Amino acid sequence: MKLQNSQLQPQARYILPSFIEHSSFGVKESNPYNKLFEERIIFLGVQVDDASANDIMAQLLVLESLDPDRDITMYINSPGGGFTSLMAIYDTMQYVRADIQTVCLGQAASAAAVLLAAGTPGKRMALPNARVLIHQPSLAGVIQGQFSDLEIQAAEIERMRTLMETTLSRHTGKDAAVIRKDTDRDKILTAEEAKDYGIIDTVLEYRKLSAQTV
């Protein structure tokens, strides 16, 4: 998948806060990510690369082993990333028995958009101001080598593109030819447009507003 240079640069982050929990088993120190995991929530908040893919796959497999019949929720706010890392997570999502809810906060771009669409039908969501970006995959770096090597790389790019199109087609209901045309260039969708496109099923209401209407 294509990424802007600014998206590839390491970003500074604040120190993740920890907190103390008291239970019948004693006292333990925890942090937001551990707490989310206990609630069967996985948070993809970085670019999709080998490291983040391994983390996500490990969490999916552990949560399935703990209870294969309970839903897993994946929150997504990611600029996208590598195609092979994307497909590794995608295959694992389809492999585990548990239903997977996908929720976009902020953005699901490139590879992350495919993961958003790959959630269990009826359980794919986004917040109102989230955005989704889809485009054709690409190989990272400058392609160099003999002509025969360039042919191999070109064939691999075409294979990746076809696989991405058929994958999105499977989960959105759009014809693969339509997806090919739409992803010739960056296609940016609002949450409502992503719903119309078939990438998500529901645009979530704010909980405060929902509570006020009850």
UniProtKB/Swiss-Prot annotation:
Single Gene Ontology MF annotation: ATP-dependent peptidase activity
Pfam families in the record: CLP_protease
Subcellular location: Cytoplasm
InterPro entries: ClpP (IPR001907), ClpP/crotonase-like_dom_sf (IPR029045), ClpP/TepA (IPR023562), ClpP_His_AS (IPR033135), ClpP_Ser_AS (IPR018215)
Record PROSITE patterns: CLP_PROTEASE_HIS (PS00382), CLP_PROTEASE_SER (PS00381)
Disulphide-bridged cysteine pairs: none
EC number from the UniProt entry: 3.4.21.92
Catalysed reaction equations from the record: Hydrolysis of proteins to small peptides in the presence of ATP and magnesium. alpha-casein is the usual test substrate. In the absence of ATP, only oligopeptides shorter than five residues are hydrolyzed (such as succinyl-Leu-Tyr-|-NHMec, and Leu-Tyr-Leu-|-Tyr-Trp, in which cleavage of the -Tyr-|-Leu- and -Tyr-|-Trp bonds also occurs)
GO cellular component, as recorded: cytoplasm; endopeptidase Clp complex
Keywords: Cytoplasm, Hydrolase, Protease, Serine protease
Function: Cleaves peptides in various proteins in a process that requires ATP hydrolysis. Has a chymotrypsin-like activity. Plays a major role in the degradation of misfolded proteins.
Protein family: Belongs to the peptidase S14 family.
Quaternary structure (record): Fourteen ClpP subunits assemble into 2 heptameric rings which stack back to back to give a disk-like structure with a central cavity, resembling the structure of eukaryotic proteasomes.
PANTHER family tied to this protein: ATP-DEPENDENT CLP PROTEASE PROTEOLYTIC SUBUNIT, ATP-DEPENDENT CLP PROTEASE PROTEOLYTIC SUBUNIT-LIKE-RELATED
Name of the protein: ATP-dependent Clp protease proteolytic subunit 2
Organism: Mycobacterium leprae (strain TN)
Origin organism lineage: Bacteria, Bacillati, Actinomycetota, Actinomycetes, Mycobacteriales
